[in-house]
Amino acid sequence: MSGKHREISVAEFFEKNKHILGYSNPAKAIITVVKEAVDNALDACEEAGILPDIFVRISKVDDHFKIVVEDNGPGIPREQIPKVFGKLLYGSRFHEIRQSRGQQGIGISAAVLYAQLTTGKPATVISKTPDEDRAKKVVLYINTKKNEPEIVEEGEEEWYLPSGTKIELEVAGNYVRERKQSVYEYLRETSVINPHAKITFVEPDGTINEFKRVTDDIPQPPKSIKPHPHGIELGTLMSMLKSTRATTLRRFLKEEFVRVGEKIADDVLRKAGFSGDETPQEMGRDDAAKLLNAFRQTDFLPPPTDCLSPIGEAMIAKSLMAEFQPEFVYAVTRKPKVYSGHPFLVEVGLAYGGEIKSEKVTLLRYANKIPLLYQQGGCALTKAVESVNWKSYGMVQNRGELPSAPAVILIHLASTNIPYTSESKESVAAIPEIIDETRLALQEVGRRLKEYLERKSRQQKKKKKEEMIGKVLPLIAKKVCEILEKEPLEIDRIVARIMGYLHVERIVEERDGVKVVTIRVSNFTRSKKSIKLYEMCSGNVEADGAKVSGSGYSTVTWSLEVKPDEEVEVSYRLKGRIINKNPLVEGVEEDLLSGAEVMNFA
């Protein structure tokens, strides 16, 4: 029996157990291949401070699919290309403690392995760094016996990008479009949580989808931190003791852990029964166990949070507004917390009404900016949504279910160590601290929605009064104008004056294919109004005296002061389309506004 045992490589293991990495069925396999390549592209661009411009194409080749993913990132040096794409468990972030999309060095090489298993075709990688004149091309397989790359072709070629990486894979699978679990939906949700990225996707039938960049602001890259004493396990501690360069146990504590200074080190040593002069490399399992027990008895400051990279409230709200065109949107980023020594934070966005027509709430789940498309029912983020009493916030809900409303709920969990339920990283485990933080964030956006709905109800009552005035006033105005032989009056403006509103009017004229847009703001309230006026547009915008931000989608912003009975006029030129139905205003209550909508996000 013993003669039958032999060592197998990690590549051989995943060759026989590819379902562990997300390749459990043909449709899911194509999504996973695209996901791994796009995640790599986003990480590379962000680390280099480059606004991501990612191109994805899927085409049918005989009875399988060719997948091409191309980015404008920093590129990969030639000597690193074979190991990055042809060796499992080869990566740059495995030993770092910081937020990142991938960490183990398995993702993209597993996609290469899946391609060669299902079609027998090698991966083609083209990459160029900024200091190179020509791109490097490498065609390779993975030797599963050795877990090493096998290069079958390499060379140089001209490439149109100054830097970047392109990977081509041919895989077996099924391409689907009209469902939640699809490549299209994955890329759409990726664009929502990465508003700084532009993603172009060409489908097998030639359909071109462009997910535009909403902001030019690149997220601040997270920093690496040392382990926190409350997040360490016995085996890891033993390994750290053996490999440290520290010559004494006291120096080991201070140099190898975060939040351990002289005073804390003394406290830990006293509780563990050590002097601090011990040699770390000579300490055994029992010594490590004493040290670990002392860690658990000691209060440490939470780990620093600059190892996390949140999306931010404004960016989440702006992204939801651009993608779904709701009537209400609000986002919240909770302060970082810790579970088992691992920093994490929760962000939640809620979009309601407007162009959202679905009866059931759409839930978008993310972990470290990656969409979670599968296992929604078994995910802690879903459980947190179901545990909130949404009836209190104006939605319909059956107990223990997602609420029913024309709404989108976005949840983003960022952490140095996402507690996934499996290796395929499809759902989050039920960690009490994470569920509690998610509930608090959901309740906060719920309260904001309730306030909005109550204001909307008051406004509807006021509108009824307006309608009554609106029915009578035109008849009176018409008769008066006929008698006095005057031009017809602006009824909306007169109603706004009677009701005491801040009235906004948008006038659009077409001149030689260019929209000339004039916005007139009239203050019929009793107080001065300091407001911000917004228009969201796609196309080329020229606006004197306004701030224009973004590319692809542009936000035009005016800061205005309007005194009682004063009228202010602004204008801009647009070669494109206006996204928002009515002008958006910040700085005035909704029940005092007519002709525009209140900007409902922080």
Curated annotation (Swiss-Prot):
<dbReference type="Pfam" id="PF18000">
    <property type="entry name" value="Top6b_C"/>
</dbReference>
<keyword id="KW-0547">Nucleotide-binding</keyword>
<comment type="function">
    <text>Relaxes both positive and negative superturns and exhibits a strong decatenase activity.</text>
</comment>
<dbReference type="Pfam" id="PF09239">
    <property type="entry name" value="Topo-VIb_trans"/>
</dbReference>
<dbReference type="InterPro" id="IPR014721">
    <property type="entry name" value="Ribsml_uS5_D2-typ_fold_subgr"/>
</dbReference>
<keyword id="KW-0413">Isomerase</keyword>
<dbReference type="GO" id="GO:0005524">
    <property type="term" value="F:ATP binding"/>
</dbReference>
<protein>
    <recommendedName>
        <fullName>Type 2 DNA topoisomerase 6 subunit B</fullName>
        <ecNumber>5.6.2.2</ecNumber>
    </recommendedName>
</protein>
<keyword id="KW-0067">ATP-binding</keyword>
<feature type="binding site">
    <location>
        <begin position="92"/>
        <end position="93"/>
    </location>
    <ligand>
        <name>ATP</name>
    </ligand>
</feature>
<feature type="binding site">
    <location>
        <begin position="102"/>
        <end position="109"/>
    </location>
    <ligand>
        <name>ATP</name>
    </ligand>
</feature>
<dbReference type="InterPro" id="IPR010979">
    <property type="entry name" value="Ribosomal_uS13-like_H2TH"/>
</dbReference>
<dbReference type="InterPro" id="IPR040494">
    <property type="entry name" value="Top6b_C"/>
</dbReference>
<keyword id="KW-0238">DNA-binding</keyword>
<keyword id="KW-0799">Topoisomerase</keyword>
<dbReference type="GO" id="GO:0003677">
    <property type="term" value="F:DNA binding"/>
</dbReference>
<comment type="similarity">
    <text>Belongs to the TOP6B family.</text>
</comment>
<dbReference type="Pfam" id="PF02518">
    <property type="entry name" value="HATPase_c"/>
</dbReference>
<dbReference type="InterPro" id="IPR005734">
    <property type="entry name" value="TopoVI_B"/>
</dbReference>
<comment type="subunit">
    <text>Homodimer. Heterotetramer of two Top6A and two Top6B chains.</text>
</comment>
<dbReference type="InterPro" id="IPR036890">
    <property type="entry name" value="HATPase_C_sf"/>
</dbReference>
<dbReference type="InterPro" id="IPR015320">
    <property type="entry name" value="TopoVI_B_transducer"/>
</dbReference>
<feature type="binding site">
    <location>
        <position position="40"/>
    </location>
    <ligand>
        <name>ATP</name>
    </ligand>
</feature>
<dbReference type="GO" id="GO:0003918">
    <property type="term" value="F:DNA topoisomerase type II (double strand cut, ATP-hydrolyzing) activity"/>
</dbReference>
<dbReference type="GO" id="GO:0006265">
    <property type="term" value="P:DNA topological change"/>
</dbReference>
<dbReference type="InterPro" id="IPR020568">
    <property type="entry name" value="Ribosomal_Su5_D2-typ_SF"/>
</dbReference>
<feature type="binding site">
    <location>
        <position position="71"/>
    </location>
    <ligand>
        <name>ATP</name>
    </ligand>
</feature>
<feature type="binding site">
    <location>
        <position position="425"/>
    </location>
    <ligand>
        <name>ATP</name>
    </ligand>
</feature>
